[in-house]
Amino acid sequence: MIRICPSILNADRDNLPSEIARISGESDLLHLDVMDNIFVPNFTFTFEESKKVIKECPIPVDSHLMIADPDERAYLYAKAGSASVTFHYEASLNPMQTISRIKDEGARVGLALKPATPFQEIASLMEHLDMLLIMTVEPGFGGQSFMLDMMDKVKQARKDIDSRFFGKIWLQVDGGVSLETIAQAAESGADTFVAGSAVFNSDNPGSMVDALRALALKSSAR
């Protein structure tokens, strides 16, 4: 199954409800990028702002936490109603405890890897995850170029997911996903795609979601 998750990082912040309405009918989840200006050099949403988006969004929210203290705060985003909460392995001192706290609140749990973090470093945690997020840009800003060299990591993760977990763990890519790059990611084994600039900078965001899905389906064996 292919999933398209538009990121509101590049949406019009002053008109978020209408921006979300433009893609909600075509999208599987809304990707909420939470940045604290500590773990990454950018700030996006406060927790209160995030709660408002989660509460009012007509489709499930996938909260991606680029924050320095996920061990203390990640579960709060699950408690606020996120369907899925993803935190960064690099920011966590106790990933197993954080995974458990998110699951205890009833949300799916994802683990994100920055480009420099090898897949093998988190292989032992895979059995506890619902999703693995492989960053295809350096986290912090939208509109960056897709890192094609991350496809080896995606292929490695896909092989592990299929061989050990029968394909049940979602494999997400985030960063630079567009009509020009989604095919490579799908061919490499990704099944869940975050797209920000490509969607919200287009004339018709909903149609762009459909176009991205069609390309991913055509390029994927999943």
Regions found by a protein language model. Give the residues of each.
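Glycine-rich phosphate-binding active-site loops on the catalytic face of alpha/beta enzymes
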Residues: F87-L93, T136-S145, S188-M208
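N-terminal active-site wall of soluble small-molecule enzyme domains
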Residues: H31-R101
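Structural motif
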Residues: G25-E26, E56, A80, E105, ...
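Conserved, mostly hydrophobic/aromatic
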Residues: L16, I23, D33, Y77, ...
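Glycine/Thr-rich beta-alpha phosphate-binding loop at enzyme active sites
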Residues: L29, D36-T44, E48, P115, ...
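Catalytic cores of alpha/beta
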Residues: I20, D71-K79, T117-H128, V177-F193
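Hydrophobic faces of well-ordered beta-strands that scaffold small-molecule active sites
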Residues: I4-S7, L30-L32, V61-L65, V85-F87, ...
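Alpha-helix-loop-beta-strand connector modules within alpha/beta enzyme cores
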Residues: F43-S63, R101-G110, M150-L171, L212-A221
